[in-house]
Amino acid sequence: MKKIFALAIFLLGAQSLSARDRQSFDKGWLFTLADSAGMSKSDYSDRHWRSLNLPHDWAIEGDFSPSNPSGASGGALPGGIGWYRKHFSVNPKEKYDRFTITFDGVYMNSTVYINGHKLGTRPYGYSTFEYDLTPYINKKGDNVIVVKVDNSDQPNSRWYSGCGIYRHVWLTKTMKTAYIPQWGQYVATSPQGDVRVKVDFAASGKKMKLSVRNTIYDAAGKIVAKSQGVQEQKLKVKNPHLWDIGKGYLYTVKSELLVNGKVVDVATSTAGFRDVKFDARKGFFLNGKNLKINGVCEHHDFGCLGAAVNEDAMHRKLTILRDMGVNAIRSSHNPPAPELLNMCDSMGFLVMDESFDMWRRKKSNGDYARFFDEWHKKDLSDLIKRDRNHPSIIMWSIGNEVLEQWSNAAADTLSLEQANLILNAGHDASTLAHSDELSVNSLLTQHLAKIVKEYDPWSYRPVTAGCNEPDPKNHLFKSGAIDVIGFNYHHQWVKDVPKNFPGKPFILSESVSALQTRGYYMMPSDSIYTAPKEWWLPYTDPSFMCSAYDNFHASWSSTHEETWDVVKHNDFVGGQFIWTGFDYIGEPTPYAYPARSSYFGIIDLAGLPKDSYYMYQSEWTQKDVLHLFPHWNWLPGQTIDMWCYYNHADEVELFINGKSQGIRKKTVYGAKNEGDAFRKSTEYHVMWRVNFEPGEVKVVARKNGKVLREQVIKTAGAPHHLVLKKTYQGHQAYGSSDPTTFVEVNVVDKDGNLCPNADNQIFFSVSGEQGASGHGFLKTPTILGTDNGCQTSLERFTDSHRKAFFGKCVVVIKGKGTLKAQAVDLKDASVAL
């Protein structure tokens, strides 16, 4: 991965010296969370505005409040209207004469100006877009870029969206004589080493001889193929290294545009050789190997850091998921940041690239449905053109749980209550297709799929959609345009897929929706808890928590073990995308405010794994897993259910203070129904029901009678001191020169045992490190945020203090220096960054 990154830097550096100069435009912006006339004008006084660098999310800096119109589903954080301004100058001797600005993402309703001239508006908050600055650029004086961001029409999202210019911004300089437009390089490969490259270009109209020169480099920077000719070319790489899961071997394709033999512009892209196949009987194949898509759905926020892109936080997320055994990411439910796809390419993750959460029918008052008719073709085609060269992408999703699955009768007059009824209940036969004549909704599905195929015609990437209506009369399915059938939930219907969709490959595009709070356990653990019983019924519990045993889920969903069993034991199921990998801000099902973040994640909002993480790790990886839970701090004599996830062992035995509580083995059952699609069923944990007594509980794993591993949990005493552990140190390759560090904070007793019920308020401070130049200056690091995974914590994310939640919290710091943690009556702790 380092070699690949170094090669990309070399190539970009080379091009910046000659034909093209693309530079970050993130630094030196001014911002105000206000709105008044004249802010778009170049001479508007902005001297009192706040200085900041992008990416930026202003909502995460705000206070939680039930009065914020985003509601608990939107994270109960503020929206509003914000303005950004950036002053810059251009070298009057600049050789370039064409200037464009690219925004990777602005949420939402952005309007951009240059020197008082309006460049355009882009409503969709997840689209990448470009404007040509050339006609208005001032080469002899000050230039002012102004961006208005209007996220005041709330609610407009079913989850936390963030507010502002939350992704990167780029300034690109080229020559007007001839240039390659945005996303003008299209690269497609075959596993046999065939490469097809098409390069679009624009020219000034003068008489000139144009040609394209393509060069392919391997990961070591060696030229492995080259050609020169017309716009579309075919090349061959001999014995290519295949791109694979966990082995993201990347080639680089450099396309140079030549005028009369001189290079005037260049575009580069990574490329990978892999063979992707979906099969109706055997599921999914990569490079000829039959395997399961072990995926998760991910929203775009980074917990306490909000929606603003942070490459270190992004890489940390992927690293934690990879260690769990995840091999695929679904970008739920919108186009992802380009950096996520770059990382998935290099780390070897599969990707379902998703476009929309709604089409013409709205799910919330201010959502994208109001822009769909005018903007969907532009937004979808831009997504495909931007992302089509990424080898990690194996399928395109044109929508998630869109209400067009059901009848188009009164399509635009549904109330939100009616829409939610259809969305969550479904299965009303009267709203499904009743003839072979295609409905408006089926035709719309075909239209969207056609756009995908138009802009990605060379690579076999199927079109799918996340559908929570499993009936084959679903209007999306009736269209015939869905290449891979995707069910959201409904694992009970999976057995009928081969009958209902003959010849069609199948995946669970969204699954599970278990509800869990890290560190909280509801007993008896063999009881299944569902909440709410029906989606429209209010659910309240004084704890505002959900059980961390795998025994609590939403009414439309299942436990982790139940759905994994279906996926594992049915060959035709290509895999699943679990809802979700990480908790995310917003959508706090089953609760209302003060809950403000989700319970769905296998990993909490702070990035701390819940217990089910280890079930997947025991099934999806070759790591040795032995995970006993819960903690061992209870009332004397209290009946406690102890669970254990394990692998690579025949049996496990539990001991309390040295006394055996019995041996357990995971059970594999025979076929539930001999003739149906389900072949067998498996237990993925073992359990002991025991009486608590202070001391220690130990589990021992054996194979063939030989002890393999042991785990001991001791009864913790009173909180005594803090322990700081750097769990992730950022990489300069992904972030800036000041990497982001994540530090886990544990409250422990005098012997170092975690205090599982500790909720101490912990205060953080940072100090700088000595300057490397020897001038004696101090550079102070910054606390970016704090979190503890508690869904009802109303402490501001940007505060420098946080209560421990079940003994733990996390602090995020940017820069180098020392972090100090303090709490009343506890010994301090510090760690060097």
Mark where each language-model region is.
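Bacterial Sec-dependent N-terminal signal peptides
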Residues: 1-21
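Short flexible loop/turn segments that cap and initiate beta-strands
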Residues: 42-45, 209-213, 246-251, 647-666, ...
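Non-catalytic, glycine-rich low-complexity segments
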Residues: 20-36, 47-91, 102-106, 142-207, ...
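Beta-strand-rich structural segments
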Residues: 198-201, 254-256, 642-646, 700, ...
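Extended acidic/polar, glycine-enriched regions
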Residues: 138-140, 200-279, 688-695, 703, ...
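Accessory beta-strand-rich segments of carbohydrate-active enzymes
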Residues: 21-25, 32-35, 79-181, 204, ...
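Extended substrate-binding grooves/exosites of carbohydrate-active enzymes
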Residues: 33, 51-67, 117, 168, ...
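Short S/T/G/P-enriched beta-strand
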Residues: 278, 621-641, 647-649, 708-742, ...
